[in-house]
Amino acid sequence: EFINRNGQFTVNLALMEDNVPSFGFVSTPIDQTLYWGGKHLGAWRLRDNTLEPLHTQACQTPMRVVASKSHLNQATRDFIANLGDTTLVQAGSSLKLLRIAEGEADVYPRLAPTCEWDTAAAQAVLEGAGGKVTQVDGSPMEYGKANILNPHFVASS
């Protein structure tokens, strides 16, 4: 997203404890917004000198599915089609996870490659807001592996 100069990039920092993101800090430099939080700490957003707590929302009808602006592959399209009545929310980079934390989306299926540094910080923020991120089989995300690529995953409120 940075290379494409579309303003949808983030700077991500995660504190890892036992290969689990316990705290995350995400910055969106273009709109000067900061997000931070952790599973047992809560989550917040600072924008325009206003500090707001973040909370996921109950799943809406139609379901609000957030997907990549630049990596919407056929597997993701098929996954979304199987959800039934949906509205597509597009965002780039780790902003997709943050849209769920802000209550602006319900689910984010990621069925294309990402790396650990793409998700760990925003996962901590999302979990602080009440959401979750799991591999598509429902098992927890794995970090600190020899292979830094993430498995396919689903984030949800």
Predicted features along the sequence, with ranges:
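Acidic beta-strand-loop-alpha-helix segment within the catalytic core
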Residues: N12-L98, N147-S157
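Glycine/serine-rich anion-binding loops at beta->alpha junctions
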Residues: E1-T10
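Oxyanion/phosphate-interacting regions
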Residues: R77-N82, L97-S157
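Glycine-centered flexibility sites
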Residues: G7, A14, G24, H40-G42, ...
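Residue-level marker of alpha-helix boundaries and capping positions
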Residues: F2, A67, T87, A112-P113
